[in-house]
Every structure is written in C-alpha cells, then in structure tokens.
C-alpha cells in the first residue's frame, strides 16, 4: 500500500451517498420483506437502486429481482412468493403496472417522487398536444424507459450533448426535428450532470425558440447537491475517489465531473477495490459517493486509508440533506388498474 503513504488529508463531500428517494425505496423493501415473510418472498421489478452491494444484501434476505414480470411465473413454480411486487426508485412504464395488476400482484410503488413528477409532466404535456424532447444518457436507462412509456407517441429521445453518438436511439440536440416546432417541451432524466443538462437545453432553445422549459427545480435536488459538493472540494484536492456502480447514472456523472475538475478521479464499488497506485504523490484526496451507495462502503475506504496513514486528517466538507419521502402504501390489483 506504499502509494498511499504520502496522504495527509481526506475531504469527504457532503452530501454524499443515499438520497431521500433511495432511503425510501430500500426501507420499503426491507420492511415489506420482513412483514410478508410468513406469506412468502418479495419480488422487486428492476434493481431497487443501481448498486450491486445493496442488491446483494437484499437478495441475502430472500428478495428476488426481475427485469421482466414474466419471470414471476417461473419464480412462483420454484419459490413461495408473497404475490407482491415492488417497483424500483427509477420509475416504470404504465404497461408494467397493468401487467402486474393482471397477474394479481399487490404493488408497492417505490418510484422516487421526483421521477413521478416528470412522469406527470409527460402525461400532461402530451395531453395538451405538445411534443416532448426527453433528454437522457441512454435509451436503456430505467428512468428513460419509464418516462417515455407515459407518452411514447409524443416523445422524442434526445442525447445530453456530451453523449451525442453514444446511443443511436437518442437524437442529436443540434439536429433533432419535431412535427410541430410551435408546441414542444423539454423534460430530462433526473440524474444527469446539471451543467450538461442546462447546456443541452440551451442548444434546444436556440433550435426551438418557443421551447417550453421546466423550472430548474425539475432537476433532482440530490443530483445537484452532490455535484456542487464535488465542485467545492475540487480546488483543495489532487485526486478524487467516487464510490459508485457503473450502472448508476448519477454516480458516473460525479466521476466525470471530478475527472474534469481534478484530472485524477477513480471509480470503485467496494473498499477492497482501492488501488495504491491511484494515490501516488497525492497529499489531499476528495471522496464522494453516488446517491445509491451505502455509507458503510465510504467508511470502509476511510478505514483502509487510516490504516496506512495513522495521522490522516479526515474533513467532512459541507452539509447533509434533511429531505425525507413517505414510504409507499400497498395497492391492490384493482387499485392499480383504476389508476393505470
């Protein structure tokens, strides 16, 4: 671990780690897995949050994760299920809700309220005859699938400007076309880089002068806060560690931001992935984590750094968030169909 021996100070970004939506979703799964264990095992549609450690810990408690509700039929033959499905924090298309109800499943919708807000806007603008330009980083991201599914006939997927060409299903904001340029609105995936999202909206605004632009509040507060925390620390450090899954959009945007500001930024999911050569010549280090990364993983990294540097100074920089979301209530198949 010789590469870490010169480290003198670590700045821990605040806020970091779990946001209110993630806390709500994970706590809902844990509570209902325990409450329903006499009836059977719980099923979650998609990873509850994009973090492998979280998923593995829930699997150890008997929770099953599926990417297609058709998998529930197979599980019913192999396991004793509680006939309850939890929808992940990222949102889901209306067709999935209907499918769950038609299968007789009770639904716990753990979609983040901020994502639900975007879904509501998509439905409203589509009903009013607008064309929706939905900015995202991948057509495969669960949040994009969910929002697109609310109004597929009126929605055009657009790449955030830094990702143009990476996914051919996402249009270039500089050349995208809509059937009616007079009635067009922009919505966004909530976990993108705030700066990149605003830059992409500016490009679209030039192309479509009558573009309806939601308020900045439509960008996820947790995404903004974590990115601002990295910006505050960046001038004080020579390298950054970002604890995130490669599937976490908000986490990967933190990594890109840290790389752009500091130059040396490294991704890891678990403390044991820390590599000494990353910290060669580094005296001051910044650490942050994605909105779906458990805090104990961050503390595990700090413990490893302290073991190599007994006099290491650890500075908590910034303030924690105080927002909390209510846990979802179970919905019967009839209630789901009524609201679908």
Curated annotation (Swiss-Prot):
(2E)-4-hydroxy-3-methylbut-2-enyl diphosphate binds at residues 50, 90, 141, 190, 248-250, 292. InterPro entries: LytB/IspH (IPR003451). Its cofactor is [4Fe-4S] cluster. Keywords: 4Fe-4S, Iron, Iron-sulfur, Isoprene biosynthesis, Metal-binding, Oxidoreductase. Isopentenyl diphosphate binds at residues 50, 90, 141, 248-250, 292. Pathway: Isoprenoid biosynthesis; dimethylallyl diphosphate biosynthesis; dimethylallyl diphosphate from (2E)-4-hydroxy-3-methylbutenyl diphosphate: step 1/1; Isoprenoid biosynthesis; isopentenyl diphosphate biosynthesis via DXP pathway; isopentenyl diphosphate from 1-deoxy-D-xylulose 5-phosphate: step 6/6. It catalyses: isopentenyl diphosphate + 2 oxidized [2Fe-2S]-[ferredoxin] + H2O = (2E)-4-hydroxy-3-methylbut-2-enyl diphosphate + 2 reduced [2Fe-2S]-[ferredoxin] + 2 H(+); dimethylallyl diphosphate + 2 oxidized [2Fe-2S]-[ferredoxin] + H2O = (2E)-4-hydroxy-3-methylbut-2-enyl diphosphate + 2 reduced [2Fe-2S]-[ferredoxin] + 2 H(+). The active site is at residue 143. Catalyzes the conversion of 1-hydroxy-2-methyl-2-(E)-butenyl 4-diphosphate (HMBPP) into a mixture of isopentenyl diphosphate (IPP) and dimethylallyl diphosphate (DMAPP). Acts in the terminal step of the DOXP/MEP pathway for isoprenoid precursor biosynthesis. NCBIfam families: ispH_lytB. Belongs to the IspH family. This is 4-hydroxy-3-methylbut-2-enyl diphosphate reductase. It comes from Thermus thermophilus (strain ATCC BAA-163 / DSM 7039 / HB27). The lineage of its organism: Bacteria, Thermotogati, Deinococcota, Deinococci, Thermales.
């Amino acid at each position: 671990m010789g590469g870490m021996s010169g480290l003198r100070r670590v700045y821990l970004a605040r806020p970091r780690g779990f946001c209110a939506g993630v806390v709500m979703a994970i706590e809902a799964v844990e509570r209902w897995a325990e409450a329903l264990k006499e009836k059977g095992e719980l099923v979650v549609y998609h990873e509850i949050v994009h973090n492998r450690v979280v998923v593995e810990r829930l699997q150890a408690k008997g929770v099953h994760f599926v990417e297609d509700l058709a998998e529930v039929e197979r599980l019913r033959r192999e396991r004793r299920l509680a006939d309850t499905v939890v929808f992940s924090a990222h949102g889901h298309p209306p067709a999935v809700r209907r499918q769950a109800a038609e299968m007789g499943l009770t639904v716990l919708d753990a979609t983040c309220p901020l994502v639900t807000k975007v879904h509501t806007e998509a439905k409203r603008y589509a009903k009013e005859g607008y064309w929706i330009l939905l900015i995202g980083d991948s057509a495969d991201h669960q949040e994009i699938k969910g929002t697109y599914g609310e109004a597929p006939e009126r929605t055009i997927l657009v790449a955030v400007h830094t990702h143009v060409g990476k996914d051919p299903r996402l249009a270039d904001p500089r050349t995208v076309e809509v059937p009616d340029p007079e009635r067009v609105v922009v919505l966004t995936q909530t976990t993108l880089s705030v700066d990149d999202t605003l830059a992409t909206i500016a490009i679209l605004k030039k192309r479509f002068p009558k573009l309806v632009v939601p308020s900045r509040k439509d960008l996820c507060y947790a995404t903004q806060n974590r990115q601002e925390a990295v910006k505050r620390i960046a001038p004080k450090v020579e390298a950054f560690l970002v604890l995130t899954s490669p599937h976490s959009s908000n986490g990967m945007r933190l990594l890109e931001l840290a790389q752009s500001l500091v130059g040396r930024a490294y991704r890891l999911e678990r403390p044991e992935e820390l590599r000494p050569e990353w910290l060669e010549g580094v005296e001051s280090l910044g650490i942050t984590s994605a909105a779906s990364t458990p805090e104990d993983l961050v503390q595990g990294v700090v413990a490893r750094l302290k073991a190599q540097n007994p006099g290491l100074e650890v500075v908590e920089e910034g303030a924690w968030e105080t927002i909390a979301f209510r846990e979802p209530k179970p919905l019967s198949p009839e209630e789901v169909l009524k609201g679908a």
